[in-house]
Amino acid sequence: MVSVSEIRKAQRAEGPATILAIGTANPSNRVEQSTYPDFYFKITNSEHKVELKQKFQRMCDKSMIKSRYMYLTEEILKENPSVCEYMAPSLDVRQDMVVVEVPRLGKEAAVKAIKEWGQPKSKITHLIFCTTSGVDMPGADYQLTKLLGLRPYVKRYMMYQQGCFAGGTVLRLAKDLAENNKGARVLVVCSEVTAVTFRGPSDTHLDSLVGQALFGDGAAALIVGSDPIPEIEKPIFEMVWTAQTIAPDSEGAIDGHLREAGLTFHLLKDVPGIVSKNIDKALIEAFQPLNISDYNSIFWIAHPGGPAILDQVEEKLALKPEKMRATREVLSEYGNMSSACVLFILDEMRRKSAKDGLKTTGEGLEWGVLFGFGPGLTIETVVLHSVAI
């Protein structure tokens, strides 16, 4: 007779969860940040709000963003004027867009990841799909399963409305799935489209305007599994440890509410201050067991909520400017793509490390950290181990 403990042992993988492939995708419509205020105030019929436009111009100038990608083109916005007003009932219109576009963009990223992985898609055992852009039944996970032609018995997990920290959440969940299910290959997809949050400017709600200056569209996909098959699967990063915590005294720091007018976004407190205040504790918990206390000796992937968060974290930890290079590069080229951002940064880091001839995927360093920040205020921490190039 076989014991339960023997069954459990046989069910578990031996090695750590490993990122085996990364793919990214964006809509074709590229928006230049320098000219965006003119476009935004024109398309929303708000050109008479001269002072507000000047404020928005300053926000865009200080954002450290050069460009973003958006599904919403001038043509789409002209056809759907309710989306351009500040709080006009427009949820139906927005939903009709995102329930199609979110899985479609996710598919584009997933196809790239599967191609890099080099294995048949029939070997995918689990799917994690994450979006803060719209809600539907059956969900975006189901739609993606159909679009990709995955097996009907793939084990699916749908994460709706998590917000900007969720790039860390999907890695945490993928790690647990890969390590506890021998031979599992998890397809992870984060797909975000700002059609749910786009709206005209308001004199009284400047936090909404901050979102209009920062958010962009993008999807990222990973293949995660333990015990990579030698010569066939090529490891990129290993995931060693994960944690999630709610920062103390941070209730209401970042809120999002699904309303008739779409997803409304609220920044109620000093978010950069809360993040920088709590980052030390998160790092000690993560790296003390590894005897690492010099945070310049590790590689960094942080969700770029905005430049102020990165500036304050750098200052608090006395980080060298190059530590946030990959993070700032992604913010500059794509804006804040919510949950997809940290996965884009993983991709940017491994590509630049290889291009520069460095020894590992993590800028030549062995250990690294990935941080997700978002509503709650919730902090996700992932300890990464790089792979030799």
Curated annotation (Swiss-Prot):
Active site, per annotation: 164
SUPFAM superfamilies in the cross-refs: Thiolase-like
Pathway: Secondary metabolite biosynthesis; flavonoid biosynthesis
GO BP: flavonoid biosynthetic process; polyketide biosynthetic process
Reaction(s) this enzyme catalyzes, per UniProt: (E)-4-coumaroyl-CoA + 3 malonyl-CoA + 3 H(+) = 2',4,4',6'-tetrahydroxychalcone + 3 CO2 + 4 CoA
Enzyme class: transferase
GO molecular function: naringenin-chalcone synthase activity
CDD domains, alphabetized: CHS_like
Gene3D superfamilies found in the cross-reference section: 3.40.47.10
Keyword Transferase: yes
EC number: 2.3.1.74
Domain of life (superkingdom): Eukaryota
Pfam families recorded: Chal_sti_synt_C, Chal_sti_synt_N
Keywords per UniProt: Acyltransferase, Flavonoid biosynthesis, Transferase
Signal peptide stretch: none
PANTHER family: CHALCONE SYNTHASE 7, HYDROXYMETHYLGLUTARYL-COA SYNTHASE
Function of the molecule: The primary product of this enzyme is 4,2',4',6'-tetrahydroxychalcone (also termed naringenin-chalcone or chalcone) which can under specific conditions spontaneously isomerize into naringenin.
Family: Belongs to the thiolase-like superfamily. Chalcone/stilbene synthases family.
Name of this protein: Chalcone synthase 1
Species the sequence originates in: Cicer arietinum (Chickpea)
